[in-house]
C-alpha cells in the first residue's frame, strides 16, 4: 500500500473534478469531453494532437483519454504511485465498475483503488450518513436516498434534465428576445450567462407578473465582442424548467420536487422522516440562488404536515461529491477499505462488487 497522497477523481456527467485527499477543493476542474477538431487547419500552431479535451469537443467521451489527461496533464502525477478514489453514478452497470477497476490496475498500475457512489460522498461531505441527495450535474439529475451510508437502489430516480438542457433552454429564451446563440462557442456564452445571472423564483407566477410590470429583474451582460445584451425574466424562467419541465418546455418528465418526493415514498415508512429532514443539494446545476428555498416549499406541499422538512444547500455543493471523497479517504478507518493490487491479482475485477458496496 502506497504512502503517497490519494488522488480523488469525480467523473461528473459534464465536468471532471480531480485533486488530492485531505484538501478542501479539487486542483483541477475541466470538461469531461473528448473529440476531434472539425477544422484542423484552424488549429495549426496550437497543438497537432488529433484529439483534445475541452469545451469545443462534443459528445465523444473516452474515459481512458480523460484519465490520462487527469493524471499526466492536470495533476502531474504517476498513477502507479498513488491510491485512487473514483466516483460513479448511482445504478451504474456492474460491467462499468469492473471496466474502471480493470483499467486502473492494468493500464495505470495503481497500487490501490476504491469506487464510491457520488451521492453517498455528497452526504459524507455534510457529515451525514442518512439523507436523500438531489444531485443535478450537467447531463443528468438523480435523487438518491441513503440510509446509514448505503444507497437504497430501488428508490433511486433519475431524469435526463440537467445543466446542458438548461443552457439550451436559455438559448431558446434569448432567441425569443432577438439574440441568436447557436454554435458551440456561443452556447458557452449562454452557459456563462446562466451561471452568472439566473436564479430560482420562490413564487414563479408572482415573479413573472413583476417582470411584466417593472424592469427590476433586468441585468446587462457584456458579450466577448463588447456588445451588451439585456436579460430580464429569462433569469428565472430558465431554471424554472427544473420545477416545471412540461409547462416550460414541453417535456413529460418528473420535476425535481416530484423526483425527490417519489424517491422518499419508495423507501420504508420508518426512514422517511429522516430523509425529509436531510434533503441535500449537490452538483453544479443546484447552484442557483433560491433553489433550496423553492425546493423546501415544494416538498412541504407534498410531505405529511407532521414532518419538519429540511433542505441543505451548502455554498460549496458544486464540489460536494469531490469533498466527500477527499474526507472519506482521509479517515484512518478507511485504510482497510481499499482494493489493493494483491486483491485485484487474486480475484480479478469482480472484487469491486465485494469491497465497494
UniProtKB/Swiss-Prot annotation:
Compartments, record wording: Cytoplasm, Cytoskeleton
Main location: cytoplasm
EC number: 3.6.4.-
GO terms for MF: ATP binding; hydrolase activity
Pfam families per UniProt: Actin (PF00022)
Transmembrane regions: none
Keyword Hydrolase (UniProt): yes
Keywords on record: ATP-binding, Cytoplasm, Cytoskeleton, Hydrolase, Nucleotide-binding
GO CC, alphabetical: cytoplasm; cytoskeleton
Family, similarity comment: Belongs to the actin family.
Name of the protein described by the UniProt record: Actin, cytoplasmic
Native source organism of the sequence: Oxytricha fallax
